[in-house]
């Protein structure tokens, strides 16, 4: 009898423990699901706000990177074929578009003269003293004037930068002055013996002569590398110029 009673108690105890553990397990599982559902990044409204802000900020940065750079000229004028007539007033209008950029670096540009289809322009200030910058500025000025100016035959003007493009003794001497320290070391100077300059830029010719600073009557021998350097400097400034040496 006692054995039967103990067996019944054992069965009831086992059943009670099993039911209790099952309820606890279901509660923990529900709690885990609650945590998972409420902290899912894609379903959490609290996390969506900062993500949206980040996306907007990223979009703004991308827009800044893809922004159109500052442009001086309006392309619509040229695209429609609207040009200014070749005269001093219209040339000044176009140059006024360029001047603000040049004046930032203490430079400027001025109209010298207009002869037929030749447009003579002079660089001023730092536009001349900085050789590397002057080449870029000259190119921009030429391109801009040719873009907006036309003569009576609807032709582009022949833009001549007098500081560099015009072949004359002063510009040649200015180019040679860049080599003056080296020539002074050799105790020689370079003079222009003959200069032929055609308006058509055909057969332009210059003949140079070396003189001894201490004794001009004394003959001197100049190394070929010095002559080559002088020739290259002049050809860079005046591509149509032929350079020869008397001695």
Swiss-Prot record:
Keywords: 4Fe-4S, Apicoplast, Iron, Iron-sulfur, Metal-binding, Plastid
Main location class: plastid
Any one Gene Ontology molecular-function term assigned to this protein's record: iron ion binding
GO process annotations (BP): iron-sulfur cluster assembly
Gene Ontology annotations for the cellular component aspect, listed alphabetically: apicoplast; mitochondrion
Compartments, record wording: Plastid, Apicoplast
This protein's pathway: Cofactor biosynthesis; iron-sulfur cluster biosynthesis
Family per similarity comment: Belongs to the NifU family.
Task performed by this protein: Binds and transfers [4Fe-4S] iron-sulfur clusters to target proteins.
Subunit structure comment from the entry: Homodimer.
Protein name per UniProt: NifU-like scaffold protein
Organism: Plasmodium falciparum (isolate 3D7)
Gene name of the encoded protein: NifU
């Amino acid at each position: 009898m006692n054995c039967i009673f103990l067996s019944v108690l054992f069965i009831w105890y086992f059943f009670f423990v099993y039911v209790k553990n099952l309820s606890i397990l279901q509660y923990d599982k529900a709690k885990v699901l609650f945590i998972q559902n409420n902290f899912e990044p894609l379903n959490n409204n609290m996390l969506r706000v900062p993500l949206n802000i980040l996306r907007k900020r990223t979009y703004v940065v991308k827009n800044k990177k893809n922004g159109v750079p500052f442009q001086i000229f309006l392309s619509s004028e040229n695209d429609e074929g609207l040009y200014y007539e070749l005269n001093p007033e219209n040339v000044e209008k176009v140059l006024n578009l360029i001047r603000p950029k040049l004046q930032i670096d203490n430079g400027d540009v001025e109209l010298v003269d207009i002869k037929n289809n030749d447009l003579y322009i002079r660089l001023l200030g730092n536009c001349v003293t900085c050789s590397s910058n002057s080449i870029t500025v000259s190119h921009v000025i030429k391109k801009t004037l040719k873009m907006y100016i036309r003569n009576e035959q609807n032709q582009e003007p022949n833009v001549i930068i007098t500081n560099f493009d015009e072949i004359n003794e002063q510009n040649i001497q200015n180019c040679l002055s860049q080599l003056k320290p080296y020539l002074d070391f050799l105790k020689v100077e370079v003079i222009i013996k003959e200069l032929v300059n055609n308006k058509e830029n055909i057969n332009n010719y210059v003949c140079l002569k070396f003189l001894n600073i201490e004794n001009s009557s004394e003959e001197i021998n100049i190394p070929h590398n010095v002559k080559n350097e002088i020739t290259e400097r002049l050809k860079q400034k005046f591509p149509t110029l032929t350079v020869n040496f008397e001695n």
